[in-house]
Amino acid sequence: MLKVIAEQEHYLLISDGQRFTVVERRAGKFYPLCTGVRHGLDLGDETIAELISRSGSYSERDAQRRLTEVASQWRELFEHVR
């Protein structure tokens, strides 16, 4: 079952109950954090496996750290170009 655990800026820490990952939310779609072409997906129980597979699976602690890191990088970039 999909669970949103935390949210910072445009990023969410999500879990399927066993695995954790961070995804980006833009324009109502959710994107894995990976290199290459990324296609937006609807967030749901049926898409969480693909998001975790493409974004990487982490322990909850490591995923929380990744969320903080990615959101901080986004904020720094936003402040720089603003």
Task: Identify the meaning behind each predicted range.
Residues 1-14, 76-80:
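Negatively charged, low-complexity tracts enriched in Asp/Glu with abundant Ser/Thr
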Residues 6, 23, 34-36:
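A structural microfeature
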Residues 8, 17, 27-28, 55, ...:
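Generic intrinsically disordered, low-complexity segments enriched for polar/acidic and small residues
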Residues 12-14, 20-24, 30-32:
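Short linear proline/tyrosine/threonine-rich motifs used for host-factor recruitment
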Residues 35-82:
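Mixed-charge, Lys/Arg-enriched low-complexity segments
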